[in-house]
Amino acid sequence: MSLAGIFLDRDGTLISHVDYLHDPEEVLPLLGIAETLRALREAGYLLFLFTNQSGVGRGFFQMEVVHACNSRMLELMKLSPEIFADVCIATERPDQPQLYRKPSPRFILESIEKFDLSLEKSCVVGDSWSDVEAGLNAGIPSALVETGNPVDDDLRCKAAEHQVSVHTDLTAMFVEKLDLR
């Protein structure tokens, strides 16, 4: 039996968006996210962290800084690293070949195979069109959350055109399914 996986963007989806986040002290988890992640894991979902970090590729900071920010996020949420089945940190700049950088579906497709995930039961959740597009490129459902980048009318139309749902936040997306009220 195939498992369900949820591919989660970091900045603007799990934590407040800070351009080129490079200071762990600036990490601020969004309200209710820790509880939602715990509930998703308890419900049997495998969680995957999928984040573009071109600041590394641009030479703004080192990979250790990204790991420190991820560790701080987990510490503030009182979660262990095992909450995520796998983590993809895409360091390519936008002008470089897109190996893992969203909207590339490579990490998703590799994870689907590695973890025997169901295409129908899995999804991508993020706050930007590149997050959504990675899911669409992999052939899995995608959803936008309004906790990071603004979801304007043009983006809403694009989302509707591609049957992409839009939610106020990650918790709102799963509130009924997980009884998070």
PLM region spans:
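Asp-based, Mg2+/Mn2+-dependent phosphohydrolase catalytic module
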Residues: 64-85, 93-124, 128-181
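Catalytic P-loop NTPase motifs of RecA-like helicase/translocase cores
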Residues: 14-16, 57, 131
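A short acidic, helix-capping loop that chelates divalent metal ions and anchors anionic groups
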Residues: 18, 23, 55-60, 93-98, ...
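Substrate-recognition element of Asp-dependent hydrolases with the DxDx(T/V) motif
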Residues: 33, 37-70, 83-96, 135
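Active-site neighborhood of HAD-like aspartate-dependent phosphohydrolases
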Residues: 1-48
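Acidic active-site catalytic centers that drive phospho-/nucleotidyl reactions
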Residues: 9-11, 52, 127, 131
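Ser/Thr-centric signal marking residues that sit
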Residues: 13, 51, 147
